Amino acid sequence: MSRVCQVTGKGPVTGNNISHANNKTRRRFLPNLQHHRFWVESEKRFVRLRVSAKGMRIIDKRGIDVVLAELRARGEKV
């Protein structure tokens, strides 16, 4: 399974580890993804999403029904 937030689309980005001696080696910065069950009152069921912390804040702000409608419009299976 890919490390991508289902709500925001955030995924890994690349950068450098920089040592005290200023040596640079490539690394990945991973998003803060969590599996979370959201209760959807309109469907009377739980929906399990893989979302970042920012994605959870978006769901808190806009509501799970609005976010699910956008996911389904994108063609994502929920």
Curated annotation (Swiss-Prot):
InterPro entries: Ribosomal_bL28 (IPR026569), Ribosomal_bL28/bL31-like_sf (IPR034704), Ribosomal_bL28_bact-type (IPR001383), Ribosomal_bL28_sf (IPR037147). GO terms for cellular component: cytosolic large ribosomal subunit. Residues 1-20 are annotated as: Disordered. GO terms for biological process: translation. GO terms for molecular function: structural constituent of ribosome. The keyword Transmembrane helix does not apply. Coiled coil: none annotated. The keyword Ribosomal protein applies. Keywords: Ribonucleoprotein, Ribosomal protein. Belongs to the bacterial ribosomal protein bL28 family. This is Large ribosomal subunit protein bL28. It comes from Azotobacter vinelandii (strain DJ / ATCC BAA-1303). The lineage of its organism: Bacteria, Pseudomonadati, Pseudomonadota, Gammaproteobacteria, Pseudomonadales. The gene is rpmB.
